[in-house]
Amino acid sequence: MKYNHTVDYGLYLVSDRDVLKGRDFIKSLEEAILGGATIVQLREKEASSLEFYQLALKAKALTEKYNVPLIINDRVDIALAVDADGVHVGQSDLPAHIVRSMIGQNKILGVSTATLEESKKAAEDGADYIGVGALFPTGTKTDANPVTLDQLRYIKENMDIPVVGIGGICEDNIKTIMEVGIDGVAIVSAILGKENIKEAAESLKASIK
């Protein structure tokens, strides 16, 4: 592990403006943080570089206010430009060891994985945590191969860095997932897609304690 500060991965919010249906982006992130989100990842695959940068600047100001880490998905340049707390990359993004060399030792590096082999490689390459999934069908990532709870447990038991579950996690399945013993859950629609974002986050937070 490279990042020296203690990070609570418990309720890991991942952004998606599409599920907000036109609601204010930063206000929605704030509601999620007030409801208990412990870390925020900005994931905006469709945004232009300028738009992503402007969103990231606003998100950084918000997360700093609440002392919550801000992670940027994929875009190392944006993360460095706004001095985000870290970067999260997938298997088809820049290799983790390259990202680590770019962001240095004092930023958080997360890597998406689906197997123990990928997870071990991520740790060797300098990852601080891994996001394992997709655990359930999800509208935000249609190409993800499902990971079973038994596979998730196997990965967790064989890893020394924090493991975050991702993919289709909601109030109906969150307790079952947390019983595996992982360190947190990454949530998109089950928070940002709800009418009352703060209440949705509070309810999920209560389920992981």
Curated annotation (Swiss-Prot):
CC annotations in GO: cytoplasm
Chain residues that bind 4-amino-2-methyl-5-(diphosphooxymethyl)pyrimidine: Q41, L42, R43, E44, K45, N73, S112, K141
HAMAP family (UniProt xref): TMP_synthase (MF_00097)
Binding, Mg(2+): D74, D93
Domain of life: Bacteria
UniProt pathway: Cofactor biosynthesis; thiamine diphosphate biosynthesis; thiamine phosphate from 4-amino-2-methyl-5-diphosphomethylpyrimidine and 4-methyl-5-(2-phosphoethyl)-thiazole: step 1/1
GO molecular function per UniProt: magnesium ion binding; thiamine-phosphate diphosphorylase activity
Keyword list, A-Z: Magnesium, Metal-binding, Thiamine biosynthesis, Transferase
Record EC number: 2.5.1.3
InterPro entries given in the database record: Aldolase_TIM, ThiamineP_synth_sf, ThiamineP_synth_TenI, TMP_synthase
Top-rank EC class of the record's enzyme: transferase
Binding annotation for 2-[(2R,5Z)-2-carboxy-4-methylthiazol-5(2H)-ylidene]ethyl phosphate: T138, G139, T140, G168, V188, S189
Cystine pairs: none
Family membership: Belongs to the thiamine-phosphate synthase family.
Function: Condenses 4-methyl-5-(beta-hydroxyethyl)thiazole monophosphate (THZ-P) and 2-methyl-4-amino-5-hydroxymethyl pyrimidine pyrophosphate (HMP-PP) to form thiamine monophosphate (TMP).
Keyword Ligase appears in the UniProt entry: no
Matching NCBIfam families: thiE
Reaction catalyzed: 2-[(2R,5Z)-2-carboxy-4-methylthiazol-5(2H)-ylidene]ethyl phosphate + 4-amino-2-methyl-5-(diphosphooxymethyl)pyrimidine + 2 H(+) = thiamine phosphate + CO2 + diphosphate; 2-(2-carboxy-4-methylthiazol-5-yl)ethyl phosphate + 4-amino-2-methyl-5-(diphosphooxymethyl)pyrimidine + 2 H(+) = thiamine phosphate + CO2 + diphosphate; 4-methyl-5-(2-phosphooxyethyl)-thiazole + 4-amino-2-methyl-5-(diphosphooxymethyl)pyrimidine + H(+) = thiamine phosphate + diphosphate
Organism of derivation: Alkaliphilus oremlandii (strain OhILAs) (Clostridium oremlandii (strain OhILAs))
Entry-linked PANTHER family: THIAMINE BIOSYNTHETIC BIFUNCTIONAL ENZYME, THIAMINE-PHOSPHATE PYROPHOSPHORYLASE
GO biological process annotation, one example: thiamine diphosphate biosynthetic process
Name of the featured protein: Thiamine-phosphate synthase
